[in-house]
């Protein structure tokens, strides 16, 4: 560790049962960092640990202008009849979407189990009984001192209090109700109810004694169908009765267009919209994966001379990053990662070599720590189980903030190198270090206890969290959803480039799921999340207890919008799911700015607008615009002009390969596929289109024309020595036709309109795998 470097606090509020790396950056994380906790947003319930016990609440919704709130409020506190103040609260177990926390003093203790998406909370007591201190005197709409359960209303919210059979209640009619547990039974649960009918209370009582003991999420990518299936499972222990299930409340991104669930008639109004309930212990979601690309193709309506000039300008600045901390240095790597393919497309070998040389040497420098070195290194903190890069920024060291934002840029650069140099990316060289970065932010291997499972990603809420400690009254938060998605697309590229399907599928799970969540909770594309009183069509930040139109710095409204677009890469096409929304978002930004054009970040805004009207975006952009620090003139110009030529993303068509995109202009589709493997690949699209793509190359096909694989001179779908022999005979005029249909197109590998010795040279290099088609 560098001298003077900062690390997270030494104290972790956990019991000895919580072994291995500590989960951070989650909805429940404030338990681990604090003596008690700050509000915990499990939805539909919220909680807060304090000296007297555990506050329970169902937020009231309200707000306008800059923010809309669903803040925690204390409807009642679950306390202990024999312990009036506990010294602290400690995490005892954290599973995929639930947490057990223990409060103990002497022989008295409470263990609370809180689960994301559960209307229940479960408690186990030792040395005393449950004491419920209400924020006022509740109305009891069901039960008396001898009932097994009570139905109560407090602050307009209905709850069920569920005790073991044989229990007694004291204090009914006052603000404090104590449950006297029978001998040998130490469990107690509560549930927030959708209404105050006895039938609803009875239904919830049926599952109130099925205590959740574990939760798990599993995912599966079907390459043939281009679908992602995610299965959520809660294990339960039945304390009494014969029922073995529970009630689960699903977020809109989970129930929307989901034919695999049977919703109950019970719903909850929450900050995330309506949560629908199901009965059982498991459910699944199935999403379409719409593909990503490592870069857009060379099909733009650009002036190639101007584009090449922009590339040369950037090449001169390649070794001059804005700063050397993990975030800003990472953004510089991201800028070069997007420019590298453009240099290749232009045949600008000098710029290409300069970009890739700097990217390699920089990553190797960061991945190597020497005695006495003070900067550009990573340190593993074994107390928390995390990899910290130094120099750090924005609390990435002491608070473990934003690791997925920072490291995503490093991963993107590594993936771009891996697509070109598999040897560099091998585990014997630099690949193992790249995978450590992946594991820090999204460890998929439950057996690797050096890092927590999916640190930054919330499997149930479907998106990432940025704060390591979640130490805010509004819970955890995430501002730049697009930087999270940048990390996930980089994981897809890395997995595909290195042939590691486990890592690739991890990336597809994270990317696809977060895109769904962003469309719901940041953009409200379906118009059923944001309250009309909020007054905006977009959330700059999403918190556990609010969504808002503000950012972490004193930025312009262009920045407030653009922070959820950047970095724009060939995996950012998801932003174009609803072109009309893009127009609305852009126009709202201009109204807020009070200008006819964005005051700054013009390149980001025009790249975004190009997903609605690329021709207009092309007219708005000009080379005098100062790029955002993670962007370049070359990439902005290339992006806008490609969309001007290709059209908008077409999400109605999928393919049986992970690296693809489909575009549509004037009802004519263009299909783009990248094949990262070392052999030719046949790709079938859901509309029947078939393409054959050469190894380590990108192919583009428009309309229904048959796709010709450059270099495949005999039409067998492969590029090998047979094609070399055919090319030689063709050039020597020993044959006048090649076996493949459209022989000139197949033989003209550099697409200069001629078939000559240059094409032969390229073909040989392709076979030797040192030239990308």
Swiss-Prot record:
Optimum pH is 7. Mg(2+) 2 binds at residues 618-619, 621. Changing residue 479 to A: Loss of enzyme activity. Optimum temperature is 75 degrees Celsius. Residues 1-194 are annotated as: beta-sandwich subdomain. The active site is at 402, 479, 483. Ca(2+) 3 binds at residues 454-455, 457. Residues 298-647 are annotated as: (alpha/beta)6 barrel subdomain. Ca(2+) 4 binds at residues 712, 714, 716-718, 723. Its cofactor is Ca(2+); Mg(2+). Ca(2+) 6 binds at residues 748, 750, 752, 754, 759. GO terms for molecular function: calcium ion binding; endo-1,3(4)-beta-glucanase activity; glucan endo-1,3-beta-D-glucosidase activity; magnesium ion binding; nickel cation binding. Mg(2+) 1 binds at residues 31, 34-36, 89. Ca(2+) 1 binds at residues 365, 373. Its EC number is 3.2.1.39. Inhibited by manganese, zinc, and copper ions. Ca(2+) 2 binds at residues 365, 368, 373, 376. It catalyses: Hydrolysis of (1->3)-beta-D-glucosidic linkages in (1->3)-beta-D-glucans. CDD domains: Dockerin_I. Disulfide bonds: none annotated. Residues 1-647 form the GH81 domain. Keywords: Calcium, Carbohydrate metabolism, Cell wall biogenesis/degradation, Glycosidase, Hydrolase, Magnesium, Metal-binding, Polysaccharide degradation, Secreted. Belongs to the glycosyl hydrolase 81 family. This is Glucan endo-1,3-beta-D-glucosidase. The lineage of its organism: Bacteria, Bacillati, Bacillota, Clostridia, Eubacteriales. The gene is Lam81A.
